C-alpha cells in the first residue's frame, strides 16, 4: 500500500482511521433504523436525526471551509427500483423523509461495508477516502412486504484535523452519499 500523498500520517494511523470509518457507518446505519422505525415517537426520531447529522460535514447544513468559502450541505442520493430513478437531496431532508414514509413498518438493515479506499491528502489537515456499502430497505403494511431493495452506495469520507487549545486531533466526517446500484 502506498501513501505517498499522506506522509504526515503513518500507514498504521490510516488503517486505524479506516477501521473507525467502518464504526462510524455502522453507527449511522443504527441511527437510520431508529429514524425509520414506526415504533419510535417523533421526539425520539428528532434526537436520532440530530445525532446522525453530527457525523457529517457541516452537520447537514452549508458550512465554511478553511478558506472561508461556503460549501453546500451534504447530499444523499436516493433511488427506487420501482421507478428506476436516482435523485439528490440534502441529507437532513433525507433523514426527515424517513420519518414520514407511508409504510406501517420500515426496516433498514445494518450496512455491509464492502470496501474503504485508501485515504489521500486533499490539503494540509484534510484527507479523503470513499467507502462502498450495501443497505437493505424493507417497507411493510399490515405485516406484508410492499417494497424492498438493496442499494449499493458510495460515501465520501473525510479525515479532518481540528486544532484545539490542547493540540490537534483528526475527526472523521461523512460526505455525500451516492447510489451505485439498486436491486
How should each PLM-predicted stretch be described?
Residues 30-37, 58-61, 136-140:
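Short regulatory "switch" loops immediately downstream of catalytic or recognition motifs
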Amino acid at each position: 500500500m502506498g501513501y505517498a500523498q499522506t506522509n504526515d500520517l503513518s500507514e498504521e494511523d490510516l488503517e486505524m482511521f479506516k477501521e473507525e470509518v467502518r464504526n462510524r457507518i455502522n453507527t449511522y446505519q443504527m441511527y437510520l433504523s431508529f429514524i425509520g422505525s414506526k415504533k419510535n415517537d417523533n421526539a425520539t426520531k428528532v434526537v436520532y436525526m440530530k445525532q446522525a447529522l453530527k457525523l457529517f460535514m457541516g452537520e447537514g447544513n452549508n458550512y465554511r471551509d478553511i478558506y472561508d468559502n461556503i460549501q453546500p450541505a451534504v447530499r444523499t442520493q436516493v433511488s427506487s427500483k420501482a421507478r428506476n430513478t436516482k435523485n439528490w437531496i440534502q441529507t437532513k431532508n433525507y433523514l426527515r423523509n424517513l420519518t414520514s414514509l407511508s409504510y406501517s413498518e420500515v426496516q433498514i438493515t445494518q450496512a455491509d461495508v464492502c470496501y474503504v479506499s485508501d485515504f489521500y491528502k486533499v490539503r494540509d489537515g484534510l484527507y479523503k477516502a470513499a467507502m462502498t456499502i450495501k443497505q437493505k430497505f424493507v417497507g411493510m403494511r399490515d405485516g406484508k412486504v410492499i417494497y424492498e431493495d438493496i442499494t449499493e452506495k458510495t460515501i465520501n469520507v473525510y479525515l479532518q484535523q481540528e486544532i484545539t487549545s490542547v493540540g490537534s486531533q483528526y475527526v472523521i466526517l461523512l460526505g455525500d452519499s451516492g447510489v451505485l446500484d439498486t436491486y
